[in-house]
Amino acid sequence: MVVVEKKTNKELNFNVKNHIEIGKQLDILDFEVAAKMSGSGFPLYKGKGALLERALINFMIDYHLKNFNYTEFFTPFLVKPDSALTTGQLPKFSEDMYHIEKDDLFLIPTAEVSLTNIHKDDILSLDNLPKYYLGYSACFRREAGSYGKDTRGLLRVHQFNKVELVKFVEPEKSYDELDSLVKQATNILDLLELDYRVIELCTGDLSFAAAKCFDLEVWAPGEEKWLEVSSCSNFEDFQSRRGNIRYKNSDGNTDFIHTLNGSGLATPRIFAAFIETHQREDGSIRIPKSLQPYMEISEIK
């Protein structure tokens, strides 16, 4: 169910290109060279494309840190099986994860895994709640179930960058925290001047770990479709029970904490929608004011 839809950009009245065409024309994306070195599903950003990717990441990190009291972490990209079990990736999604058999370690599909496991087997003090954690990571997904889906360009890749937001909160406050998590992510989309919508997932579409989830989608005019760029979820005590993450409540009793997470945001589809939305008829890309301090240019041409 669509709960918010915000379309403020004027419809482009020229021959609109998709991100693959724009990337090739401006020499900022090279999927052919990436495929030569790694196979399909791996992007190669170059020149001002690499600059834009890095600017998006740094802008997102800085925005959340400056405005919402997050603590930043730079976590391992490899985790043990029990860490992936805590957050719900194992055993159900083992086929979608890259596994290093010799060391029995998994490449993380999201920094949610490592951020949540910071407090595995901990008892947190009520005085120190809520805890807001942020982490940038590369993310790795085999996309084993992607047959028949649109995998062109940046739409579905095996390696991508993402800024992740994780919260540890008192149970009675977790749904208010979910609403604020969604707002924090959509604020980024507003500042990037992208059209977007927020979808509340029905029970049948929820992951087995989540109690409630909102998906954020951006409009990509070159693709002529909505692209999912974030999921914001309240897991209630699902992850905390698996990871034995507890807190002492106001009565002095020990109880399981509620965990939430959201992408704030994942970059590949943001990158695609960004260059499609801000393309000009002359082939250049306009850079919104929010990113100009990070790129020190006002356009890519």
Question: PLM features: what roles do these ranges have?
Answer:
Residues K7-K301:
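TRNA-recognition modules of translation machinery and tRNA-sensing kinases, especially anticodon-binding
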